[in-house]
Regions:
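Acidic, glycine-enriched active-site microenvironments
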Residues: 1-168
Length: 168
């Protein structure tokens, strides 16, 4: 499983994350952080950008499942990235919509999204718990990177060298 999330406050700083899970456990070596360049289109465009950048690394093994933190718009933009790399039908795609508490699966006909299957969260389900764990980890990792970028921009004089000299 690869889970993706975007963290931002406005459009100035946008951070993205990818966390990898293998056999139901986090695989730290598969974690990636992305500074998102796209400023137009919000989270859906950010998701598409980081997926395009990740999928361009053909030397990395593609996952069996991509989990998107977001609803229909984010998942549809992720689908566009899969389509560009010819991975529709080869890599499963799910959206994890927190507001509506639904798991979204695009229904694909002739390589296009024809509709959506929606499944309510089943908190007792082991499958749901695994998806939730992956989504929470992607969210945590994106937030952590966002804060790191924000601190560098807000407090540029307090880099690692200055901190090590005790001048903060």
């Amino acid at each position: 499983i690869e889970a993706y999330d975007i963290a931002n406050l406005g459009r100035n700083i946008v951070a993205g994350s990818l966390v990898g899970f293998i056999e139901g456990k986090p695989e730290k070596s598969a974690y990636r952080q992305f500074k998102v360049a796209t400023r137009i289109g919000g989270d859906p465009s950010g998701i598409k950008e980081i997926l395009l950048r990740r999928l361009a690394h053909r030397e990395w093994v593609y996952p069996q499942l991509i989990l998107i933190d977001g609803g229909q718009a984010q998942t549809a933009f992720a689908f566009q990235a899969l389509k560009k790399f010819g991975l529709v039908g080869k890599v499963a795609l799910l959206g994890f919509a927190k507001r509506s508490q639904t798991i979204l699966i695009p229904v694909v006909v002739k390589n296009e999204i024809a509709g959506w299957k929606r499944f309510p969260y089943l908190a007792a389900s082991p499958a749901y718990q695994l998806l939730r764990q992956a989504q929470d980890e992607a969210h945590r990792f994106a937030q952590r990177y966002y804060k790191k970028i924000h601190q560098k921009i807000t407090f540029p004089a307090f880099g690692p060298k200055r901190k090590s000299k005790g001048r903060n």
